[in-house]
Curated annotation (Swiss-Prot):
GO MF assignments: glucuronate isomerase activity
HAMAP family (alphabetical): UxaC (MF_00675)
The protein's annotated pathway: Carbohydrate metabolism; pentose and glucuronate interconversion
InterPro entries linked: Metal_Hydrolase, Uronate_isomerase
Species this protein is from: Oceanobacillus iheyensis (strain DSM 14371 / CIP 107618 / JCM 11309 / KCTC 3954 / HTE831)
Catalytic activity: D-glucuronate = D-fructuronate; aldehydo-D-galacturonate = keto-D-tagaturonate
Keywords: Isomerase
Keyword Isomerase: yes
Any matching Pfam family: UxaC
PANTHER family assigned to the protein according to its UniProt record, in alphabetical order: URONATE ISOMERASE (PTHR30068:SF4)
Superkingdom of this protein's organism: Bacteria
Single Gene Ontology BP annotation: D-glucuronate catabolic process
Protein name per the record: Uronate isomerase
Length: 472
């Protein structure tokens, strides 16, 4: 029997252990997609207790607590922070098999030196130990990032954001980690959502372009791409909950934009025409700038209307969608490829049934001279588990080129989430170790170690324009 979460946690055999400890463990982290606050990084936010770090915005934990029968007052309600923490401590033992169980203990070990198992009995002492650490001078969020060996943090930012905190971080010589903006124009794409007209008005205010017309709207978006580019952005991201694409014309998109601006809802076909033309336009801008484009596909969001009305979005009431993505996704990518303006692209689906679909689609759009131009993104959200990560990597290896994989990201709102990179790297090493053990791959530690380091760091460092490998 193995010890609980020891140095060889998740490592399947001796080869996996060698690969992790000698090649993967100490590689820097490139967190190319997350939801951290640039303001909190600039201000070097400090936390007064562990509940603030763990439970104030983590809908993963909120869902688990609800499923365990915890009252909402102890999750998002007005209970005090100690009681909320103890509710989480009592929930954790019930989560065996869930990555939250391992992530929780990894975070306790790595940041606070706590090796105890979190439960109802240990909760009070762990509360005291962790809060004592958080009170120390070296436990601001900057120190947590530095302690995690992070080189780049890419935040998620709306086109109308002024990026002032990113700008101040560039000028701050006391913090060497690159904190770069990520362009997320969802509110400009979701034309049927309530608030679209108000958002477009806000877009006009931060640009010199009137958004009363569709042409002006596109010029305003382009100007924000330019502004983000000037401020170090080289990554865009889209939440495409429903994957749709129709071959259309600018005239049709213009007509439907005007219809929406007059307060009318668009039909599904009209919405698809608007989104299709606008997404192609934005993809062209990204290609011209040398950006990386990310599509997060097939999420079914805000399913519980009663709780959505009480708490709003991103509070733990989302699920996997099961809509067909292959044809609209291929047609969208092909439209950009026909114009020779398909940017580097990362595709994620929340539905694991789409894994072989995406892995095969990216192979249709690869191009010589750009290794892994299209990427099958790492297991996302509900798939961000041991089995989900292994399935994603195994599918990529089955159909594509595993050695070109750009690896892990946190996609997190927590400054304690970086051990997820360690969790991922352990699984990479374990998977390769099993291939060696089964005689599928030769035991060539140098070659395999290079692949592990590439997936852990170097592939992403080469893929993104972050200026990390100036000697290459």
């Amino acid at each position: 029997m193995k010890k609980f979460m020891d140095d060889n946690f998740l490592l399947s055999n001796d080869t996996a252990e060698e690969l992790f400890h000698h090649y993967a463990k100490d590689m820097p982290i490139i967190d190319y997609h997350c939801h951290l606050s640039p303001k909190e990084i600039y201000m070097n936010k400090r936390y007064s207790n562990i509940t603030e770090v763990w439970l104030y915005g983590d809908h993963y934990k909120w869902r688990a607590m609800r499923a365990a029968g915890v009252e909402e007052s102890l999750i998002t309600g007005d209970a005090n922070d100690y009681d909320k923490f103890m509710a989480w401590a009592e929930t954790v033992p019930k989560l065996i098999g869930n990555p939250l169980y391992n992530w929780t203990h990894l975070e306790l070990q790595r940041y606070f030196g706590v090796d105890e198992i979190l439960n109802k009995e240990s909760g009070p002492s762990i509360w005291e130990k962790v809060n004592k650490c958080l009170a120390q001078d070296d436990f601001g969020v900057r120190e947590l990032i530095n302690q995690s060996n992070v080189q780049v943090v890419c935040t998620t930012d709306d086109p109308i954001d002024d990026l002032s905190f990113h700008q101040m971080l560039v000028e701050d010589d006391d913090f060497s980690v690159k904190v770069l903006p990520g362009f997320r124009p969802d509110k400009a794409i979701e034309i049927n959502q309530e608030g679209f007209i108000d958002y477009v008005d806000s877009l006009e205010k931060v640009t010199s372009h009137s958004t009363k017309t569709y042409d002006g709207f596109l010029r305003a978006l382009k100007s924000r791409v330019d502004y983000f580019h000037q401020n170090g952005c080289s990554v865009a991201d889209h939440a495409l909950n429903t994957m749709m694409f129709t071959e259309t014309t600018k005239e049709k998109a213009r007509n439907y934009y005007e219809k929406a601006m007059n307060g009318q809802k668009l039909s599904p076909k009209e919405e698809s025409d608007f989104k299709s033309f606008t997404l192609v336009f934005l993809g062209e801008q990204y290609a011209d700038k040398g950006w990386v484009m990310q599509y997060h596909i097939n999420a079914l969001r805000n399913n519980n209307s009663r709780m959505y009305n009480n708490l709003g979005p991103d509070t733990g009431y989302d699920a996997m969608n099961d809509e067909v993505i292959s044809k609209p996704l291929v047609n969208l990518l092909n439209e950009l490829e026909k114009k020779d303006r398909l940017p580097k692209t990362i595709l994620y689906s929340l539905n694991p049934n789409d894994n072989p679909v995406i892995a095969s689609i990216i192979g249709s759009f690869q191009r010589g001279g750009v290794p892994g131009k299209l990427q099958f993104g790492t297991a996302w959200w509900f798939n961000d588990t041991k089995s989900g990560m292994i399935k994603q990597m195994q599918t990529l290896a089955d159909i594509g080129v595993f050695s070109q994989f750009i690896g892990m990201l946190t996609d997190s709102r927590s400054f304690l989430s970086y051990p997820r990179h360690e969790y991922f790297r352990r699984l990479v090493c374990s998977l390769i170790g099993e291939w060696v053990h089964n005689g599928e791959v030769p035991y060539d530690l140098k070659s395999l170690g290079e692949i592990v380091q590439d997936i852990s760091y170097y592939n992403a460092a080469r893929y993104f324009d972050f200026g990390l490998l100036s000697d290459e």
